[in-house]
Amino acid sequence: DEWVSRLHDENPGLSIYITADHGMNQKTRLINFQAVAERAGFALYCLPPLKDRYIENHVYQEGGTLYVFLKDAARDAEFVDFARSQPEVEQVLTAAQAAEAYHLPEAAIGDYVLLAAPGCAFAELPGERLHTEASRTHGSLYEREIPLLAIHPAAGPEAYRFSKDIAAILLEERTDP
């Protein structure tokens, strides 16, 4: 707040935009989907796209999306039924469906993409499930809303549908005669 206020005070007509790269929500129900699926007899590998070494923010590498690589394609239908039966899973998409819907590289996202239910996340846990009040994460359908604060915006609120619209509008404004 102090730095934005100072910037505004020193440049009162300046357009200032503050946004984020994604939304964030509390997730109280975490599932180690790989452990649950393996206990049910499925041979698979689960990859959370959020996975990184910065564990201060994601202690359990938790996120709202999971790429699933099945080792036995003959069990596809059985796997889909199993995944859909888990309360933490809201959607089960084939790689082709996920690639088309979310502009993902189909060859790199496994056989299936799982999307978490509200308040849930896929996580790397020592057990199968964990209820916690300490997890805030992103990567599900419920973090698509991104905050935008604008001081002297170049256009009205309806013009800013995507974060990329900020740059497009400012560049357009600069190049207009």
Spans of model-derived segments:
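Feature captures the catalytic ectodomains and active-site-proximal regions of enzymes
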Residues: D1-P177
